[in-house]
Amino acid sequence: MVIKLIVGLRNPGSAYEQTRHNAGAWLVTALAQRHNSHFKIDKKMQAELTEIDINNHPCRLVLPLTFMNHSGQTTRIISQFYKIEPGEILIVHDELDLPVGRIKLKTGGGHGGHNGLRDITAQLGTGEFHRLRIGIGHPGHKDLVHQYVLSRPSMHDRQQIYDAIDRGIAIIPIVLSGDMARAMNQVNA
């Protein structure tokens, strides 16, 4: 199945823009910029939206206007409106369980405690969508997670995340073509 929708998870607003939790939105924003595509607010869709076309594979890019815990609402509204199946969706998000700067592509699975993924799974009625996971590292103890994801990374960690974003963007043409196995082999190596 080809990917028709890429959603970069985030918390909206300038207070959250540079936080670790917004790493998914960083990638989707950089992808749009590299293709000279500009986001426009669509209040009905509860998102900033734009479109790109790579090698004759058109794709909608989404930055939800809802907070992370309600990302599923935006994803459901857009996927229903454009008749996009869960298997045609790529969710790009921060991942505590990957070291800073690692990136992994996977299909399906649980939410792993990520509230954005939890809501998307609930709203779509399935977890069978694709995920591009950007490693932000773990603070070491579960009680520190909330504060950690809502804080800004150090300059060193930020650069590692940006490097991971570059590697993620490099596989997007393969992802859009629907060759997930090849994309996984390239990025997960």
Swiss-Prot record:
Quote the catalytic activity from the record: an N-acyl-L-alpha-aminoacyl-tRNA + H2O = an N-acyl-L-amino acid + a tRNA + H(+)
Residues the record annotates as the site (Stabilizes the basic form of H active site to accept a proton) are 94
Any one Pfam family match given in the protein's UniProt record, by short name: Pept_tRNA_hydro
Q: Where in the cell is it found?
A: Cytoplasm
- Active site (record annotation): 21 (proton acceptor)
* Gene Ontology terms: biological process: protein quality control for misfolded or incompletely synthesized proteins; rescue of stalled ribosome
EC number(s) reported in the record? 3.1.1.29
Q: Where are the transmembrane segments?
A: none
How is the quaternary structure described?
A: Monomer.
Q: What is this protein called?
A: Peptidyl-tRNA hydrolase
- What organism does the record attribute this protein to? Legionella pneumophila subsp. pneumophila (strain Philadelphia 1 / ATCC 33152 / DSM 7513)
Q: Encoded by which gene?
A: pth
